[in-house]
């Protein structure tokens, strides 16, 4: 009896213990989790890893637009100003040929009215166009006189600086087309000293040179080309303008292209290997040559257009050389005339090459009489 009573009490105690144990776990508080952890886990979507490689990101780098400049000859100054007005939106720089070198080596201003110079200067400044006048020399006498004596060329430099300050020009362009080879070192020294003085005034040095395309002996201008060391000039000058025309010269008795496109490419390839690309300007001709027998006549594009219109000549363009070409009977008799000249298509091809070689710009010879060929 006593044993049964004890078992009964033990059973009651065991039952109460199980109930208490169950209630404990029922009301036990859950472990808190941070809201951020909970949200990130609930929103996480597991995606299969892509087996395809990501495409490389290629930046679309826009090439800087070609700068366009043009020379204005002293003998057609007013016509040149008219051309600047007409092409005001495309020009970045103009180079009026205002100066030359006297036989004694001194700087000489060409006969151009001061009012015309001021008119051009004002027009250019109002339209954010740089004015960098040219000092041109086409004979050995003047350059020899200047380079044989350092005091003379130093005086020449001082005169250039004075003129730049007088008219507030943006710099100076040098076009010395006849220099004796013995003055090569002196010429380079002259450039360096001129550059030093221009830099003090924050002005630009531009040097115009003949086209070079190999290391061969050149038939014409060979002595000057020896002096025009592209590598040395390129280190000193801010801009180097290459006269990439007159492949077939005015003096040639046989007709031929003025600047065939394949030759221009050789010139650019040769030049860009020696001069920083951002300094190079490709010279582009805007004129034509007409051969009557063995005689040659230089023509503006206006004259070329008149001939083509008068004779009803159409599609006068040679794709092989990227120039205009026409062959016709001359008015003067039974002789055959041949004419090579610039065209819109030709200019476009030259711009394509300039962009291909990533040079700075192009320079037109010359502004005036080109009609709408630049548009």
Regions found by a protein language model. Give the residues of each.
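Short, acidic/polar
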Residues: 73-89, 147-165, 221-231, 342-355
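Conserved, mostly hydrophobic/aromatic
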Residues: 94, 174, 194, 240, ...
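Active-site-proximal beta-strand/loop segments in catalytic clefts of secreted hydrolases
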Residues: 71-75, 96-99, 134-138, 175-178, ...
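Substrate-binding surface in catalytic domains of secreted glycosidases
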Residues: 107-112, 180-311
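Glycan-recognition patch characteristic of GH18 chitinases/ENGases
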Residues: 30-32, 39-154, 158-159
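Acidic/aromatic/glycine-rich contiguous surface patches that form carbohydrate-binding/processing clefts
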Residues: 350-375
């Amino acid at each position: 009896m006593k044993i049964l009573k004890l078992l009964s009490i033990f059973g009651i105690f065991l039952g109460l213990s199980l109930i208490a144990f169950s209630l404990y776990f029922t009301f036990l508080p859950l472990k808190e989790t941070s809201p951020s952890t909970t949200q990130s886990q609930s929103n996480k979507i597991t995606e299969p890893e892509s087996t395809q490689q990501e495409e490389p990101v290629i930046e679309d780098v826009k090439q800087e637009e070609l700068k366009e400049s043009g020379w204005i000859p002293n003998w057609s100054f007013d016509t040149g100003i008219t051309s600047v007005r007409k092409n005001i939106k495309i020009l970045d720089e103009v180079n009026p040929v205002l100066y030359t070198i006297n036989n004694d080596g001194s700087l000489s201003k060409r006969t151009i009215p001061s009012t015309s110079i001021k008119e051009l200067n004002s027009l250019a400044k109002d339209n954010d166009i740089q004015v960098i006048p040219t000092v041109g020399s086409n004979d050995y006498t003047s350059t020899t006189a200047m380079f044989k004596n350092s005091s003379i060329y130093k005086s020449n430099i001082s005169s250039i600086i004075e003129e730049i300050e007088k008219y507030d020009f943006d710099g100076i362009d040098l076009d010395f087309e006849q220099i004796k080879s013995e003055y090569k070192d002196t010429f380079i020294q002259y450039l360096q000293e001129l550059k030093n003085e221009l830099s003090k005034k924050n002005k630009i040095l531009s040097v115009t040179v003949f086209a070079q395309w190999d290391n061969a002996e050149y038939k014409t201008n060979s002595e000057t080309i020896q002096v025009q060391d592209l590598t040395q000039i390129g280190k000193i000058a801010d801009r180097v303008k290459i006269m990439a025309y007159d492949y077939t010269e005015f003096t040639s008795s046989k007709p031929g292209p003025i600047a065939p496109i394949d030759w221009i490419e050789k010139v650019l390839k040769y030049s860009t290997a020696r001069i920083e690309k951002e300094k190079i300007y490709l010279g582009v001709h805007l004129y034509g040559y007409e051969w009557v027998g063995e005689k040659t006549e230089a023509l503006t594009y206006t004259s070329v257009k008149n001939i083509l219109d008068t004779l009803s000549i159409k599609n006068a363009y040679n794709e092989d050389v990227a120039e205009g070409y026409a062959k016709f009977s001359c008015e003067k008799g039974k002789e055959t005339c041949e004419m090579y000249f610039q065209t819109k298509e030709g200019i476009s091809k030259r711009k394509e090459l300039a962009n291909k070689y990533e040079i700075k710009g192009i320079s037109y010879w010359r502004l005036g009489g080109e009609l709408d060929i630049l548009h």
